[in-house]
Amino acid sequence: MPSLLCLRVLTLSEYDNIVELPNSIGNLIHLHYLNLSNTGIKRLPSTVCTLYSLQTLLLAGCWSLFELPADMRKLINLRHLDCSGTQIEEMPVQMGRLKSLRILTIFVVGKSTGSTIGELRELSHLGGKLSILKLNNVVDGTDALQANLKNKKDLNELELAWGSEDADHSEKVRGVLDKLQPCMNLEKLTVKRYGGTSFPNWLGDSAFNKIKVMHLEDCHYCFELPPLGQLLALKELFICKMKFLRTLGPEFCGQPFQPFQSLEKLEFKEMAEWEEWVLSGSGGPEFPRLQELILKQCPKLRGSLPYDLPSLKKLIVKGCGVLHDQRATATTNTSTSLNYNCLEELEIEDGCQTGLLSLLETKLLSNLYIRHFNDIQCLPNINRLKSLILSNCPTLLSFPEDGLPTSLTSLDIYRCRRLEFLPHEMLAQLTALDSLTLWNSCDSMRSFPLGIFPKLTTLDIRNCENLESLCLIEEEGAVENLSHLNNLNIEGCPNLVCFPQGGLPTPNLTQLCFSRCEKLKSLPERIHTLTALRLLDIRDLPNLESIAEDGGLPPNLRYFTIEHCERLRASSSSVGDWGLQELVSLEEFIIGGGGNDEILETLLKQQLLPTTLHYLRIKELSTLKSLYGRGLAHLTFLRSLSIGRCDSLEFLPGEALQHLTSLQELYISNCPSLQFLPEEGMPPSLSYLHIYKCSGLEKMYQNKTRQDHWASISHIPCIRINDEVII
């Protein structure tokens, strides 16, 4: 690096192929800023510690980095050290000498060889976020007190985490947490894997009047929560995996007449033994500003939710099977109606009892998600919904008697096989419906009525096994209604055989996809009239016999994929009728799968690929032995060429590749018969070559053993063979 000796800033972030730095990095004595974030770096050379001018060292997301250099203490001008997202096991000794540090994202407490927690004492200017990890290595409360967190007034986020091994739930660990009391200026606090049976008094002290966010995670042995209702600024509270907690009582709210005055989001998750939520009975709403309440995997929680949540907008309840169960114990009152007048979004899942369905009458409710309900046959009437998602309701038979609300804009139905799709007259009422998704549902549906929804833009039907046709309703306005449709996707409908006669009257359709429709023999007629179509994706249609032979492909197509359409082999002589060469907007073409070998050969031999192509992907053509050069040579705008899983491919046309003057990327994968790259070399424009699982090419090029062959690719800036970067 002799020419870089005056360098002050060096950024190498996001290059995951960088696994080490040269020792000569130490020669950059003027370097102030070094960013190695999200690289594959495994170790830093010791010479990094001679960069005495270094002020910023960023190592965030270096997942392979397990240690820092031993002499880090020498970087006395370092102000910002970010090691978040690394695997560092302990900090080097004497980190306390880095007194200029303003940002230290993590501090991993060492055992006998690394830094003790006392090294934090001298780092009095730390601000921002600090995570102290492996607190199980702290000797006792006296040791913890040495960290002097109380006086670190610039810290606004603090994480205190013990190791992942079995937690120590003795009095010692409570003493450690007690002495780690932070400054009152703290805004966010996270405690993870704490092993004590109770929390120290400072946690929940009303003097912490700036804390806005708190996370208590994996504190398995605590049997009660601190009085968090006293934290007047608290806006978000997340509590997870407190397996010894059985009752959440008035102590949670603390002393104030109106607890949780600022709380807006409350989440409980994976509380395996939690059975009862007892409110304080303070007289007014206990969560006056709560907007979002989330309960997940609390299988024993019985009774009712807090009944008065006047500001609640979003409620998610998952895996709480006995909550609101009217068959719960007689001592629990579940009859009180819920006052959730501002509720806009409701998500209930995994067998939550139907008592919660009373919330469907809430006037402002606009988004509803019901999943894994096993004892519901008919949906109750719903008033003003905009979005409805039904998933995995095996007993659901019908929609509400009055139909769905006319305000509905999005309807998604997944795995509701017994559900009867809406009758024609009810479908016609959904005048605002914009998106409709049907997956593995409505087994009784044989035909889908196109043109019934005047504003539908997206229709996605998958795995509807008995669907036979898409038909155009014979009503005035049906064709006009289809003018809004932009996206049509049909997948996994094995009995689909026909479309409306004369084709799809969808002038604004931009995406059209068909896959895994075994009986389908042809695409819709007059597909060339779809002048707005940009993407056409055809996959796994084994009986498809023809494509666009009555006028060619849509003229403005940009992306075209055809894979695994075996019967098209017999039609390869009419490939010219597709009019591919006339598609001046086509940028991406993907072809692959059984039977498409002949199609590709025809396209190349007749030079039918348009010159506008930017991306060409050839895959899974088992009998393809070579690429006909003349069919490639004219693709002067091609930027990326990908060839994969072509077992019989033996050589590439070198002369033709030389004509690809815009080619930047070449990917070759799983082509075992390919032994050499062209002797003529690669085009000068090529900047990236990736060879993956090609045994012949690996032997020839991986170790640069054959200089005559290596010379043909040595000009390429980046060559990657499997997962190893060669140059």
Regions found by a protein language model. Name each.
Residues 1-113, 121-139, 150-170, 181-198, ...:
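Predominantly recognizes leucine-rich repeat
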Residues 143-148:
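A substrate-engagement module of RecA-like helicase motors
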